[in-house]
């Protein structure tokens, strides 16, 4: 005899229990922990209206609004904010401190003031030179205009030059008073005549002696 084994069907309550256990053991979806929640269209609209009326809950964008362009706007806003923050950081890094900026401005002002002072001194010196030159030219013109003119005299008087007085016995005081035979004339004339004769006699004797000595030595 052949026997046929027939397996009994599994109990239904066990399947239901297994389904419940599987549902309980499944982890919650990752979307619930994030800030974005996907909700059905109708339920999301209803919740949005309710939240708008109450005014106390935050607006949670739906998947349709994200796909319709909200995500692009959010990305653009984030990009702009990141660009602004980076530009601020670079500007803070590149821009000098207020003390350095003040020092640079002070140095620039000192340099410009020195340049202006040197230029002003040069201009003052040049101005003084020009004023002195103008004064000299004005003085020369005034001197030339105020000088006396060379006016010739009205009458010409011709005068002969004075002759030099020659020394002579005739114009002496003795000759004028008594002539040749006056006592004053004789007092001057006789001594001078005697002295002249004595000098002539002495000179003749001296010359004769000098001439006689070489002739005697030759013999």
UniProtKB/Swiss-Prot annotation:
What positions carry the motif BH3?
A: 126-148
GO MF term list: identical protein binding; lamin binding; protein homodimerization activity
Of the GO CC terms on this record, one is: nuclear speck
Positions of transmembrane segments = 188-208
Gene Ontology BP term (one): defense response to virus
Q: Keyword set for this entry?
A: Apoptosis, Endoplasmic reticulum, Host-virus interaction, Membrane, Mitochondrion, Mitochondrion outer membrane, Nucleus, Phosphoprotein, Transmembrane, Transmembrane helix
- Residues with the modification Phosphoserine, per the entry, are 62, 117-118, 120, 166
UniProt biased composition (Low complexity): 42-51, 82-97
Q: Which InterPro entries match?
A: BNIP3
Cell compartments where the protein resides? Nucleus envelope; Endoplasmic reticulum; Mitochondrion outer membrane; Membrane
Compositional bias ranges of the Basic and acidic residues kind: 69-80
Assembly and binders: Self-associates. Interacts with BNIP3 and STEAP3. Interacts (via BH3 domain) with SPATA18 (via coiled-coil domains). Interacts with PPTC7; this interaction promotes BNIP3L degradation.
Outline what the protein does: Induces apoptosis. Interacts with viral and cellular anti-apoptosis proteins. Can overcome the suppressors BCL-2 and BCL-XL, although high levels of BCL-XL expression will inhibit apoptosis. Inhibits apoptosis induced by BNIP3. Involved in mitochondrial quality control via its interaction with SPATA18/MIEAP: in response to mitochondrial damage, participates in mitochondrial protein catabolic process (also named MALM) leading to the degradation of damaged proteins inside mitochondria.
Please identify the protein, giving its name as recorded.
Answer: BCL2/adenovirus E1B 19 kDa protein-interacting protein 3-like
Which species? Homo sapiens
């Amino acid at each position: 005899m052949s026997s046929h084994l027939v397996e009994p069907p599994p109990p239904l309550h066990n399947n239901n229990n297994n389904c419940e256990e599987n549902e309980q053991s499944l982890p919650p979806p990752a979307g619930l922990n994030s800030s974005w929640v996907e909700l059905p269209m109708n339920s999301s609209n209803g919740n949005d209206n309710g939240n708008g009326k109450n005014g106390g809950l935050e607006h949670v964008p739906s998947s349709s609004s994200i796909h319709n362009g909200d995500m692009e706007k959010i990305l653009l806003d984030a990009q702009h904010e990141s660009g602004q923050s980076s530009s601020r950081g670079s500007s803070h890094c590149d821009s000098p401190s207020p003390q350095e900026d003040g020092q640079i401005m002070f140095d620039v002002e000192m340099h410009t003031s020195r340049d202006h002072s040197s230029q002003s001194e040069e201009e003052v010196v040049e101005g003084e030179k020009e004023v002195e030159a103008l004064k000299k030219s004005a003085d020369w013109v005034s001197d030339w205009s105020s000088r006396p003119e060379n006016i010739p005299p009205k009458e010409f008087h011709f005068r002969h030059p004075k002759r030099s007085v020659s020394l002579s016995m005739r114009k002496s005081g003795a000759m004028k008073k008594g002539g040749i035979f006056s006592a004053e004339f004789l007092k001057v004339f006789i001594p001078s005549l005697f002295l002249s004769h004595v000098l002539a006699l002495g000179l003749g004797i001296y010359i004769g002696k000098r001439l006689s000595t070489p002739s005697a030595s030759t013999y």
